[in-house]
């Protein structure tokens, strides 16, 4: 368990308790507010360091998923020197009209960066987009794994999931 990061997420107020509806539609008694840890420079820097250390050998690009994991991919890119791309959920209808923004080449190995994994619907959509474009994705990282089936869904798609923190660690840790 990464005690420093668990404490940081709690101390910044990123872990909230109450009645919440998650993006999946599920109800929960706790919420991990990614915008709290993504907008705190100290927390973001620590997360970037952690992600940079997990980048698998042979990786050519990181991938951030619109909108939530873009700051995470950006800081990990800065910390590691590894370029990144942005994966959109849908084309904008103007400009370049791309689903994958940034520079990349078919066949490159990509390490997907995600904020919070619950059902993994967003991560799976991004992985399918990357694979359809000819990029190789077999590993990803998330800051928090809520341990609600997302990891298993990703593994069924052949994607190894690394998490910086698991919900059981967040909820069970007492300093």
Curated annotation (Swiss-Prot):
GO biological processes: 'de novo' UMP biosynthetic process; pyrimidine nucleobase biosynthetic process
Family under the similarity heading: Belongs to the purine/pyrimidine phosphoribosyltransferase family. PyrE subfamily.
Keyword Protein biosynthesis: no
Name of the gene this protein is made from: pyrE
Domain of life of the source: Archaea
Species annotation: Methanocella arvoryzae (strain DSM 22066 / NBRC 105507 / MRE50)
Assigned EC number: 2.4.2.10
Record keyword Amino-acid biosynthesis present: no
Residues involved in 5-phospho-alpha-D-ribose 1-diphosphate binding: 88-89, 92, 114-122
Protein name per UniProt: Orotate phosphoribosyltransferase
Pathway linked to the protein: Pyrimidine metabolism; UMP biosynthesis via de novo pathway; UMP from orotate: step 1/2
Chain sites annotated for binding orotate: 118, 146
Cofactor needs: Mg(2+)
